[in-house]
Structure formats: structure tokens, C-alpha cells
Swiss-Prot record:
The active site is at residue 56. Its EC number is 3.6.-.-. InterPro entries: Anion-transp_ATPase-like_dom, ATPase_ArsA/GET3, ATPase_ArsA/GET3_euk, P-loop_NTPase. It is an enzyme of class 3 (hydrolase). PANTHER family: ARSENICAL PUMP-DRIVING ATPASE ARSENITE-TRANSLOCATING ATPASE, ATPASE GET3. The keyword Zinc applies. Transmembrane segments: none annotated. It comes from Caenorhabditis briggsae. Homodimer. The keyword DNA damage does not apply. GO terms for molecular function: ATP binding; ATP hydrolysis activity; metal ion binding. One of its GO terms (cellular component) is neuronal cell body. This is ATPase asna-1.
Amino acid sequence: MADDQLEGSIKNILEQKSLKWVFVGGKGGVGKTTCSCSLAAQLSKVRGRVLLISTDPAHNISDAFCQKFTKTPTLVEGFTNLFAMEIDSNPSGEGVEMANIEEMLQNAAQNEGGSGNGFAMGKDFLQQFAGGLPGIDEAMSFGEMIKLIDSLDFDVVVFDTAPTGHTLRLLQFPTLLEKVFTKILSLQGMFGPMLNQFGGMFGMGGGSMNEMIEKMTTTLESVKKMNGQFKDPNCTTFVCVCIAEFLSLYETERLIQELTKQGIDTHNIIVNQLLFPDTDESGKITCRKCGSRQAIQSKYLSEIDELYEDFHVVKLPLLESEVRGGPEILKFSERMVHPEKNTNQ
């Protein structure tokens, strides 16, 4: 099977010139930020303008590059075409799930024909939508951010995402917004009188009904484009980062299954923080705990190789020092392109 395995590098991503969106995510504490910064650094060598975006509330890319970033794209020191920015996108809390949104949309459609009941159902739908759906403000901000990125004409965008649960909800935003906006615009006669009242909920401010409809239509066009690109493997891919431990492997499998369900391409896995212990002249590992840890990692590496034989599995070592600053990130990023370097720390 070893002969059939794909190369353990990110060369396939660097060579795919059609890619526009690259997401990097996984369980917390596995080194996602270092990997996303390194991937962005490598992309800056082979692509035009590259943008790195942190959607993680912790915003670690500033610490990684030793440079403060804001919600405005800023040139990364030491690079000529790599920019970075941090946005707040935290869809947390309990509320209406996608299944509930589907039911609300269906109810609104069924009552479209009745004048009084239709208006009441429309109002009820918007009230539930405003009060019960967590992250709608973040979803709108995400949509506006995508429009901004498009206007700035970046060749490729790398997302340093938050831990898995947050990221999966974030990736649902385009589909959710497209369904809701499409339904509301199809029922303008029913919702029209209430759009001003609920305009603030959509982050669109005040204005006349016609202005509100125009803004919503424009946003819907951007959301449809974004949704189509996210589900196009020529435009979008997701890089999963994990470590060789049970919980991380379990969450990686859950993430891959959910990405497949959402129609988002993923064919790269980065296994980070691997031990390559020192040995004596006879080849015996000199550190007993290091040997035990390596044995555990080897077990899960074998499972990863078996489960994901159709993935590019990049295996990165645990280093003796932190990877911080542009030069160190660039140096570390070479390990993602040249696997042969990873047996030497």
C-alpha cells in the first residue's frame, strides 16, 4: 500500500492554480495557526496576492508573525504579496438549527397564499429568525467580508479557523443565508412592510423598502457566488490538522465526514508534533518517555495511513523551539513541501 500512497506534502495545493479559498482547521491545540501561516507563506511564492484571515476568536496569527493585525488586510513584514487580517466570527450559543430554518421557510411558503395568515406567518418567521438563530450577525459579517475580499482582488485566501465545531457552523453560513434571503425575496409582498423593522437584524441599516430589497438582492448574489465556490473543488479545499492521538484522530474523522456532507473538498491532512527521538550508537531510544510517546504516535499514524490512503498526509515533527516570526515560519513551511526534511529536527 505504501507505493500507492500520495505524496506527503502540500505540493498539490501549490500546483492547483485555480484554488481561491483554502481553509485550515482541526481540534484545538494541534498547531493550526502555524500550519495556516506556513501554507500561506508557501502560496505567496507561487501565487500573486495572498490573504491570510484568522476567524479564530483567539487570533493567534499576530503572535505567530510577531506583528499586530486588524480587520483590515495588512502586508506581512518580510513579504511582498502576503497580507493578513483578523475578523470576529463567533457563532456560539444555542438556537435554531438548519432543520428548524427549513421548517420555518416551509411554513412561510405554505401560507404565502393567505393574506392575513400569510402576513402573520411572515412576521412570526422573522421574529423567530431574529431571536432564535445564533450567529446571524456573524453570518452577515462573513458575507460582507467575502464581498470586501472579492473587491480587493486577492488570488487566494487562506482561513486560519477556530476549533472544529465553530468552523463547521461558519461553513454553513453561505447555505443558510442563501436559503433565507431567497425565500424572503420570493415573498416580498408579505415581508415588504416589515423589512424596515427587521432591517437592522440583517445588518443593513434603515432606508426605504426598495433600498432594503436592493441591498438584500446584492448580498444574495454575493452569497450565491460564495456558496458555489465553496462547494467547487477547483476553487476551495480544506486542510485538516491533527496530532497522532485518539481524540484528535476522532475529531478529524468527524470533520472530514461533515465536510463531505456539506460538499466541501478535502484531500490534505497535516499530522503535527511528531516525535523523532534521539538514539544511541546501537539505535536504542535514549529517552524512555519519548519512546513510549513515539509508540503511541506510531499506532495512530498507521491508522491514519490506512484510513486516508487517498489523502496527502503531511507528517511534521515536534520542534525544540517555537515557530514565531516570518523567517521561522518560512523555514518551517519548507517541511510541508519537502517531507524528507521531517526526520531531522
